[in-house]
C-alpha cells in the first residue's frame, strides 16, 4: 500500500482509539510496518491535528527522516516487529483499566475465553522501565515473543496484529478484559480462571474463527 494511504490509516486509528476511550491527549502511539522499517506517529502532536505529512518513516536501522521527530516510543515498536514477524501494525495506549492492572504488576489471567485472542492463557505485564529507553524495548520484545499483547508496568498496553484494524480491535478487547479482571478482583482474589486445557481448545478454534478483515 502506498505511504499516504497507510499514513491516513494511522491517523484514523489514532482518532478511533480516542473515540473508544482508550486514550487521551497526545498519549499513546501507532505504527505500521513499511518497506524495511515502519511508519509511526510523531511526538507531541494531538491526534486531531495530525496530517499525513506528520507521519514519520524510520528505517530498519532506527534512522528517521530528517525534519521530523518520531514518537519517543519508537524503539519498542521496532522491538515488537522484530519479536513478531507476523505483525504489521502496533497500537500503544494508556487505557484506564489496562493501566490500573499494570500498576498492580499482574498479568491478566484466563478469566474469560477471549484472553486467547492475545495468543495464550494470559496477557503478561512487562517490567517497568523509563519510556523511550532501550531497556523498555527489550522488556517488550520478550513479553511479545508468545503473545500479541502485553501490559507495561505503570504505563499501559501494547497490541500488535496483522493490520491496524485488527490491532485496534485487540487493544479494545484487552481493555475490556482488564475491566472484567478488576471488577472480579473487587469480589475475590485470586479470581476463578479457565484451565490451560480449556484455553488450548479456544486457541485451536480461533484458528478458523474471529475477526475477518481483508489484508
UniProtKB/Swiss-Prot annotation:
Pfam families: Aldolase_II. Zn(2+) binds at residues 73, 92, 94, 155. Gene3D superfamilies: Class II aldolase/adducin N-terminal domain (3.40.225.10). Its cofactor is Zn(2+). Its EC number is 4.1.2.17. It comes from the Bacteria. Binds 1 zinc ion per subunit. This is L-fuculose phosphate aldolase. The gene is fucA.
Amino acid at each position: 500500500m502506498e505511504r499516504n494511504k497507510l499514513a491516513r490509516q494511522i491517523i484514523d486509528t489514532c482518532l478511533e482509539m480516542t473515540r473508544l476511550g482508550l486514550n487521551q491527549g497526545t498519549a499513546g502511539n501507532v505504527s505500521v510496518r513499511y518497506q524495511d522499517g515502519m511508519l509511526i506517529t510523531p511526538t507531541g502532536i494531538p491526534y486531531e491535528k495530525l496530517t499525513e505529512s506528520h507521519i514519520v518513516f524510520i528505517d530498519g536501522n532506527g534512522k528517521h527522516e530528517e525534519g521530523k521527530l518520531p514518537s519517543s516510543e519508537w524503539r519498542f515498536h521496532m522491538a515488537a516487529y522484530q519479536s513478531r514477524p507476523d505483525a504489521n501494525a502496533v497500537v500503544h495506549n494508556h487505557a484506564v483499566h489496562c493501566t490500573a492492572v499494570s500498576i498492580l504488576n499482574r498479568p491478566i489471567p484466563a478469566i474469560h475465553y477471549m484472553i486467547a485472542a492475545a495468543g495464550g492463557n494470559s496477557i503478561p505485564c512487562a517490567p517497568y522501565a523509563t519510556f523511550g529507553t532501550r531497556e523498555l524495548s527489550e522488556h517488550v520484545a520478550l513479553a511479545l515473543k508468545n503473545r500479541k499483547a502485553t501490559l507495561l508496568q505503570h504505563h499501559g498496553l501494547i497490541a500488535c496484529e496483522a493490520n491496524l484494524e485488527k490491532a485496534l480491535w485487540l487493544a479494545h478487547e484487552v481493555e475490556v478484559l482488564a475491566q472484567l479482571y478488576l471488577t472480579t478482583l473487587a469480589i475475590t482474589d485470586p479470581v476463578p480462571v479457565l484451565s490451560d486445557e480449556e484455553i488450548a481448545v479456544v486457541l485451536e478454534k480461533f484458528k478458523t474463527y474471529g475477526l475477518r478483515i481483508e489484508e
